C-alpha cells in the first residue's frame, strides 16, 4: 500500500495562524506546570519548596537552553532543505544530536549533584533534588525540541494538539489526586505525560516525512551539517544555564539562602510564563524568516517586523501587567510567607519584557546565519549579568537582585543586537539564495 506523500506547500498556514496555534499550545502547557508549582507552594514548607525550586529551575533552564539551541539550528536548516529525503535525513541528524546532548547534560548533572549542592548551600541538602532535576531535564528538553521540529516541518496544528492535550491530561490527573504532599508524585505524573507527548510528536514527524525508502536514517554529511549549525547555537543558549546557576548560587550563599531562593523561585515562574511566549514565537518565526529564498529585503523586513510587533508587544503588555499586579497576585495565590516575593516579581517582570524583544532579535540574527555573532553577544550579556547580580547582592537587595541584573544585561544585549541588524540588513537574502 502506497504511503501518503508529505503535505504540499500550498497547505502551509500563515505566520499569524501559526502564531495563534503556537501561543495556545504554550499557554496550555506552561499554565499546567504553573498551577502545579502553585499547588506545591501551598503543600511544602518554604525551605523545602526553596530546595525543590532550585532543582526545578536548574533542570528547566539547562533543558530549555539545550533544546532551544538545537531547535534554533533545525529551524534554520530544515525550511531551506527542499529535497524530501534529504530533509528527512537531516531531521534525523538533529534528533540524534539532541539525544546525545541531553544524555551528556543529564548524566553530568546527576553525577555532580552532591558537589553542586555543597557549592551552592555548603552542604549536601540539595543533592537529592538535583538528581531528580536531571530526570526532569530529559523530559523537558526532548519535548520542547520536538515541538520546535514540528514547527520547522509546518506541523503547527498537530504540535498544538499534542501540547494542549498533554496539559489537560496533567491538570485532570492532579485534580483527581487532591493536594500534593510529595514532589516525587508530581514528578512521576509529569514524566509519564511527557513521555506520551514525545511519542506522539515522533509519530507525527514520522508521518510528515514518510517515503518509500524504509526506516529513518542519517549519514555523516547530515550529522556534520547539524553539528556545524547547532554548535554555536547550543553554546549561545546553553551559556545561560551555568551563568544563571552562578547567580542563584550567590543568592543561596546568603545567610537565609534557602528562603531567598524560595522567594525568587515563585516569582521566577511568572518570568518563565511571560518569556515562554516570545520563545514560542521565535521558534515559529525562524522557519518563516529562513524560508525566504529569493525574497526581497523588504519582504524579510516586513515578516520580521510583524513578528517583533506581535511578540514584543505581547511581552511588554504581559510584563507591565505582572509588574502592576505583583502584590495582588501573591496575596491571592500564595501563602502569606511568600508575600515579600512581590518585589522579585516586579524586577523579573521588567526583565521578562526585555527578554521577549531580545529573543526575537536573536532569531532574526540566526535566520541570517550569524550564529557566532549571537554567541559573542551572549558572552557579553553573561558577563554583565553576573557582575550586576554580584553588585546588587552586595548592596543588600536580596532576591530582587537577580531580576535587576537580568534587566541591565538585557538592555545592553538589545542595543548590541539592534546595531548588528543595522549593519547586516541583507544577510538573510544572501543566505537564502545560497541554499536554493
From Swiss-Prot:
Membrane topology: Multi-pass membrane protein
Keyword hit for Zinc: no
Biological process annotations from GO: polysaccharide transport
GO cellular component, one term: plasma membrane
Keywords: Cell inner membrane, Cell membrane, Membrane, Plasmid, Polysaccharide transport, Sugar transport, Transmembrane, Transmembrane helix, Transport, Virulence
Transmembrane domains' residue ranges: 20-40, 49-69, 91-111, 132-152, 160-180, 184-204, 234-254, 261-281, 307-327, 341-361, 375-395, 396-416
Entry function: Probably involved in polymerization and/or export of exopolysaccharide EPS I which functions as a virulence factor. May play a role in export of EPS I or its intermediates across the membranes.
Protein known as: EPS I polysaccharide export inner membrane protein EpsE
Amino acid at each position: 500500500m502506497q504511503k501518503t506523500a508529505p503535505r504540499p506547500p500550498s497547505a502551509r498556514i500563515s505566520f499569524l495562524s501559526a502564531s495563534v496555534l503556537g501561543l495556545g499550545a504554550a499557554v496550555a502547557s506552561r499554565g499546567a506546570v504553573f498551577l502545579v508549582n502553585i499547588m506545591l507552594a501551598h503543600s511544602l514548607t518554604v525551605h523545602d519548596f526553596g530546595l525543590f525550586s532550585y532543582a526545578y529551575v536548574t533542570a528547566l533552564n539547562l533543558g530549555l537552553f539545550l533544546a532551544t539551541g538545537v531547535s534554533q539550528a533545525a529551524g534554520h536548516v530544515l525550511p531551506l532543505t527542499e529535497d524530501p529525503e534529504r530533509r528527512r535525513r537531516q531531521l534525523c541528524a538533529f534528533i540524534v544530536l539532541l539525544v546525545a546532548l541531553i544524555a551528556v547534560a543529564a548524566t553530568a548533572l546527576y553525577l555532580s549533584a552532591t558537589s553542586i549542592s555543597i557549592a551552592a548551600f555548603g552542604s549536601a541538602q540539595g543533592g537529592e533534588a538535583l538528581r531528580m532535576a536531571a530526570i526532569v531535564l530529559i523530559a523537558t528538553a526532548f519535548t520542547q525540541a520536538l515541538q520546535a521540529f514540528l514547527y520547522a516541518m509546518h506541523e503547527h496544528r498537530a504540535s498544538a494538539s499534542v501540547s494542549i492535550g498533554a496539559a489537560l491530561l496533567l491538570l485532570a490527573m492532579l485534580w483527581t489526586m487532591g493536594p500534593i504532599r510529595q514532589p516525587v508524585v508530581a514528578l512521576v505524573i509529569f514524566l509519564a505525560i511527557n513521555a506520551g507527548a514525545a511519542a506522539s510528536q515522533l509519530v507525527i514527524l514520522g508521518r510528515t516525512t514518510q517515503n518509500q525508502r524504509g526506516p529513518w536514517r542519517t549519514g555523516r554529511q547530515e550529522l556534520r551539517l547539524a553539528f556545524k549549525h547547532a554548535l554555536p547555537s547550543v553554546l549561545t543558549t546553553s551559556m545561560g544555564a551555568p551563568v544563571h546557576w552562578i547567580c542563584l548560587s550567590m543568592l543561596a550563599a546568603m545567610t537565609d539562602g534557602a528562603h531567598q531562593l524560595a522567594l525568587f523561585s515563585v516569582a521566577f515562574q511568572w518570568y518563565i510564563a511571560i518569556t515562554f511566549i516570545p520563545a514560542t514565537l521565535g521558534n515559529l518565526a525562524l522557519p518563516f524568516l529562513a524560508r525566504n529564498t529569493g525574497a526581497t529585503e523588504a519582504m524579510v523586513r516586513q515578516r520580521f517586523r510583524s513578528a517583533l510587533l506581535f511578540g514584543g508587544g505581547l511581552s511588554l503588555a504581559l510584563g507591565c501587567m505582572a509588574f502592576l499586579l505583583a502584590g495582588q497576585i501573591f496575596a491571592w495565590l500564595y501563602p502569606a510567607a511568600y508575600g515579600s516575593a512581590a518585589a522579585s516579581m516586579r524586577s523579573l517582570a521588567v526583565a521578562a519584557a526585555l527578554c521577549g524583544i531580545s529573543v526575537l532579535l536573536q532569531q532574526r540574527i540566526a535566520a541570517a546565519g550569524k550564529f557566532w555573532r549571537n554567541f559573542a553577544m551572549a558572552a557579553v550579556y553573561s558577563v554583565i549579568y553576573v557582575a550586576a547580580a554580584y553588585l546588587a547582592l552586595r548592596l543588600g537587595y536580596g532576591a530582587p537582585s537577580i531580576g535587576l541584573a537580568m534587566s541591565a544585561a538585557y538592555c545592553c544585549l538589545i542595543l548590541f543586537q539592534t546595531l548588528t541588524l543595522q549593519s547586516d540588513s541583507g544577510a538573510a537574502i544572501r543566505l537564502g539564495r545560497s541554499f536554493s
